Amino acid sequence: MRVTLPRRLDRKVPRRGKESAFTMIEIALSIAVVAFAMVAILGVLPTGLQVQKDNREETIINADGAYLLEAIRSGHDRAGLLSNSVYFLRVNYKDGSSDVIVADDNEPLKLDGQRMVGLLSTPKSTQIAVGVSNVVIWMRALNSTAIDRDADARDVAFRYQTVLEIEPFLAHPPRLTNGLGTNDLYRIVNLQRSLYEVRMTMRWPLFNDVSTDAQRARVGTHRRTFRSQIAGSQLFYPTNVLGMERLVYFFQPSLY
């Protein structure tokens, strides 16, 4: 006679398997690997962020420099960006004096782009002791993000200093022209009047750049120099600049 056992009695009881865990050596090695990775990440991350920041600033400087040169060459602020970006302008003279145009609270100068270009195009005097030496401006980045152009973000926006020097191109040293005749000298003078050299030095970043207290301002160690030549004549006329009569200059590339 066959006897059937109940199902609960017929089930096989599983045997208890062997338990295993990490040893202290394995745990220590894992912690060491994680710690090494964290140290490597934290050590490289600041360098990577700094490189990214430097690349971004250099990209902005290259784009802004090209725009400024084109504005001076054409005599026109085509995009109308300068009037909202420049907040300090100083014309330095060779005798040590200067003319300063500023606005309160580092606000943009209340000048239209055309007058701004005319002031930036002020030529450097070729005389020894008198005349203009250079033009210095402080400005916020033209090709930065949109949030940097907001009025509330002026203190954190990328800012830099630009020094402009424009002078007639001296292609012939005086010692080579002293023995020339009148016609040849006139031809050389006419050539020099039709060709100008532009040297623009941009330095960044700016620190303590309070426009009403320019003596406290400090400039960083980064710098980029742009050099170009402009062929044509330079037109100038007096105009009203914030209540003062000043000369503004404009290049006309098509006229000689």
Description of each model-found segment:
Residues 3, 22, 29-32, 45-53, ...:
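Flexible, low-complexity segments enriched in proline/glycine/serine and punctuated by aromatic residues
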Residues 7, 42-43:
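Sec-dependent, cleavable N-terminal signal peptides
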Residues 1-22:
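N-terminal leader/signal peptides at the extreme start of proteins
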Residues 11, 20, 25-30, 38:
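Generic hydrophobic-segment detector
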Residues 35-42:
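Active-site-adjacent bridging/hinge elements
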